[in-house]
Amino acid sequence: MHQVGSTNMMKIQSIAQLSITMDAGTKILVVGDVRGRFKQLFQRVEQVNKKAGPFEILCCVGDFFGEDKQNEELIAYKNGFKHITVPTYILGPNQREHEKYFENLTDGEICTNLTYLGRRGVYTLSSGVKIAYLSGLEAQGTADSAGSEHEFTKADVIAVRNSCLVSKNCSTEYRGVDVLLTSQWPFGMQEKENATASKLVSFLCREIKPRYHFCAINGTHYESAPFRMPKDETTQFELCTRFISLAEVGNAEKAKYIYALSLKPVDKSRLLDLAQKTTNEIPCPFIGLDLGGAIGKNDSSENRQYFYDMDGGRRKRQGGDNNKRDKRPRIPQIEQDKCWFCLSSPDVEKHLIITVGEHFYLALAKGPINKHHVMILSTKHVPCAAQLSPDDWKELNKFKAALRKFFKTLGQVVCFTERHYKSVHLQINALAFEEGYAWKIKHSFEDKAEEFNLEFETLPALDSEKMLPEMGPYFLAELPDDSTLITRQMKHFPIHFARDVFCSENLLNCDEKVNWKDCLLDKDEEVAYVEDFRKAFAPFDFTDD
């Protein structure tokens, strides 16, 4: 075991070197192609876990399943006769014949402690470690959508790239992700190019700048010297990547198929540590590659503007006229006196207002699901939380914290949602649920997302406006477990999606209240709701301080 660079990362080379003195960090195992050798894999993992664990997660790249006869080894684990000791997450199929093993899975679960990650996305561990993943092989041809479940396309790669950039921490500098998992090799990684290399994977690696990139399917173990991704619009730092290809489990050559590391999340690492150079670095293999056939110019650069802090006034671009202001898509404007939610508008229903702060006010929702259904709205004309100033954000968090404390006294937890799509004024819905229902909320969102064919990414607790896409539509839900669900898939997004979730059978079981227009109250009822809420909320109302 040896330390790599000056970062908190440890590499484990053999069972004799697996020490219980690994640096404090998130311990992760990664293995190459399993191909049905489940018994051999999980016995080996159990040994490693006892020697140098506990490990938080085991990630499998390449082919997890093998021939039908070989796959029978998994039956004992499905039936509970054998147990998987480390939570294991696998990538999807790389061949059509294996697609059947990934069908009809509930929440991706194959058996206890064995889960299919999905086609692509970003998985964030409880420690904050971010793992980007892309299943399958690059689809042949120019289609934007894959013809089968074992293929990925440009659209999938762009989606992963955007998910990584939108989930960046509050720092103005993008720091990369901790791990990238693909089955396919990136093009350009070796001088003698292999036939299965993908230019799309090269593009993805270059864009999201992982500290570690793991892949498989070539049947060989290969580790390159570390290399640095070129700086771009997302960061002025050249971030370091280590590429590792893992061999097949149980290979005759006894080539390395398992890799262990301990990571401190990039978002909690010092930029100086991430930028610290080592003595054995090589030039980035992706510089100078012609990726034009895989990614168009608009996809590779222009669309990126929606996901990072442009901040042109404080950070100079590479080349060009630094005095020119960044050009951003203009936000449709609407006169404040015609906005229903601006306090200065004659149309605002002031009898719904519970309390008013400097930047925000709290009001009863129009057509509420119940008498505790409230909204946090900006006093001024701001379209979404992503465009709030630091002072605005600070007060918004005070309102959220006050509501959490208030509902806790009632034995309830609260969920906050924001839908920014063709909206002109920031509205954040807050709805409380009995504490015993807290665990059901995320599952209910996932169920409805599947019903409407939506894909969400999971982020840590929302602690800065810079975690949100500065431009472009999105929907988010802040859950009681301090995680955040977010999607930018807003085309044909259901207008009542949040209410669909809240009113579902698993939660409030009141489908008749999905449409707010079906829940309109008489003005006298609204006034009574507001007065009752204001009185109960008074001990937590900081606006009078």
UniProtKB/Swiss-Prot annotation:
GO terms for molecular function: RNA lariat debranching enzyme activator activity. Residues 306-329 are annotated as: Disordered. Gene3D superfamilies: HIT-like (3.30.428.10). One of its GO terms (cellular component) is post-mRNA release spliceosomal complex. One of its GO terms (biological process) is mRNA splicing, via spliceosome. InterPro entries: Cwf19-like, Cwf19-like_C_dom-1, Cwf19-like_C_dom-2, HIT-like_sf. Pfam families: CwfJ_C_1 (PF04677), CwfJ_C_2 (PF04676). It comes from the Eukaryota. Belongs to the CWF19 family. PANTHER family: CWF19, CELL CYCLE CONTROL PROTEIN, CWF19-LIKE PROTEIN 1. This is CWF19-like protein 1 homolog. It comes from Drosophila melanogaster.
